UniProtKB/Swiss-Prot annotation:
Free-text comment about domains: Has 3 domains, the large (RuvB-L) and small ATPase (RuvB-S) domains and the C-terminal head (RuvB-H) domain. The head domain binds DNA, while the ATPase domains jointly bind ATP, ADP or are empty depending on the state of the subunit in the translocation cycle. During a single DNA translocation step the structure of each domain remains the same, but their relative positions change.
Keyword field contains Membrane: no
Matches recorded under InterPro entries: AAA+_ATPase (IPR003593), AAA_lid_4 (IPR041445), DNA_helicase_Holl-junc_RuvB (IPR004605), P-loop_NTPase (IPR027417), RuvB-like_N (IPR008824), RuvB_C (IPR008823), WH-like_DNA-bd_sf (IPR036388), WH_DNA-bd_sf (IPR036390)
Family: Belongs to the RuvB family.
EC class name: hydrolase
Function: The RuvA-RuvB-RuvC complex processes Holliday junction (HJ) DNA during genetic recombination and DNA repair, while the RuvA-RuvB complex plays an important role in the rescue of blocked DNA replication forks via replication fork reversal (RFR). RuvA specifically binds to HJ cruciform DNA, conferring on it an open structure. The RuvB hexamer acts as an ATP-dependent pump, pulling dsDNA into and through the RuvAB complex. RuvB forms 2 homohexamers on either side of HJ DNA bound by 1 or 2 RuvA tetramers; 4 subunits per hexamer contact DNA at a time.
One annotated GO biological process: DNA recombination
Large ATPase domain (RuvB-L): annotated span: 1-182
Official protein name in the record: Holliday junction branch migration complex subunit RuvB
Top-level lineage group: Bacteria
Cellular localization per UniProt: Cytoplasm
Length: 334
């Protein structure tokens, strides 16, 4: 799958900009008010007891700030931040090397925690619960188990697919926080903050337009703003205007609802090929030339959020809201 401008997953182009824009404290973090409120209390209580924070699971769609929140937790606790990902930890020995290097109270962030190999996950159970790991050294009759004691630490796991976590792993997290898609007003604040960091003021109307087409996702808002800034600077504007914003977003084929050409292809494919459904996921995938998993994990969540598509026992169905947005009449309508 090619990188999409409105894909919430982290892309190479995002890494540098996200590091420069990342807030360091909960007070600087915009949105997710309930999650922030809870974390503030939990962090304060842990610091009062002089204990590490309970293990934290952050879950929700990509691009909503899970990695940022993990780094903020370490900053607020006054400890070091270590970061890795589930696919990067292939063996129990890889995990042992990371855990044994932690200092007391450190935050270990594991992105895509649902992708940890089962053998690694089983080693993690004791590390999270009792702060030790057992490592088998050698093979055959001479093999022996060695116990390594670990300093108390906080594991922050992040996942876009909480349903794939095993129950034993999920139950070892003391704090579970779901990140939701952002409201327009919060995205506007993020866009204005980013524009300020870029030293390129933006009009309130332009900020609203970027926010409205960002699929409720800060990462997408910042990515779109970079391209809007390009147009505005080429035109010699001192402030990003609504006109330049609309021009840039039209060039990027991002419509008023935040849908791009791939979303349109998926929706119109079901409408034109299958009368709006119901139609099975594998059939849709074959029709538009994408993998079923990609459709289910990347394209569908926002379309479901908008109410443009429904999942039914018989397959996917396009809703009347989607027909109205696309300007297509249902078969049989006058």
């Amino acid at each position: 799958m090619d990188d999409r401008m409105i894909d919430g997953e982290l892309q190479d182009q995002d890494v540098e900009i996200e590091l420069s824009l990342r807030p360091s404290t909960l007070s600087q973090y915009i949105g997710q008010d309930k999650v922030k409120e809870n974390l503030t209390i939990f962090i304060q209580a842990a610091k009062m007891r002089e204990e590490p924070l309970d293990h934290v699971l952050l879950y929700g769609p990509p691009g909503l700030g899970k990695t940022t929140l993990a780094s903020i937790i370490s900053y607020e606790m006054g400890v070091q931040f270590r970061s890795t990902s589930g696919p990067a930890i292939e063996r129990a020995g890889d995990l042992a090397a990371i855990l044994s290097s932690l200092e007391p109270g450190d935050v270990l962030f594991i992105d895509e925690v649902h992708r940890l190999p089962r053998s690694v996950e089983e080693v993690l159970y004791a590390a999270m619960e009792d702060f030790f790991i057992d490592i088998v050294i050698g093979t055959g009759p001479s093999a022996r188990s060695v116990r390594i004691d670990l300093p108390p630490f906080t594991l922050v796991g992040a996942t876009t697919r909480a349903g794939l976590l095993s129950a034993p792993l999920r139950d070892r997290f003391g704090v579970l926080s779901r990140l939701e898609y952002y409201e327009i007003k919060d995205l506007c604040n993020i866009v204005e903050r980013t524009a300020d960091i870029f030293n390129m003021p933006i009009s309130s109307e332009a900020a609203i337009e970027v926010a409205r087409r960002s699929r409720g996702t800060p990462r997408i808002a910042n990515r779109l703003l970079k391209r809007v800034r390009d147009i505005s600077q080429v035109k010699g504007e001192e402030e990003i205007s609504l006109e330049s914003t609309k021009q840039a977003l039209e060039m990027l084929q991002v419509d008023d609802a935040g849908l791009d050409h791939v979303d349109h292809k998926l929706l119109t494919g079901i409408i034109e090929g299958f009368s709006g459904g119901p139609v099975g996921l594998d059939t849709i995938a074959a029709t538009i030339g994408e993998e079923s998993q990609t459709i289910e994990e990347v394209y569908e969540p926002f379309l479901l959020q908008l109410g443009f598509i429904q999942r039914t026992p018989r397959g996917r169905v396009i809703t009347s809201k989607a027909y109205d947005h696309l300007g297509i009449k249902r078969t049989g309508e006058d």
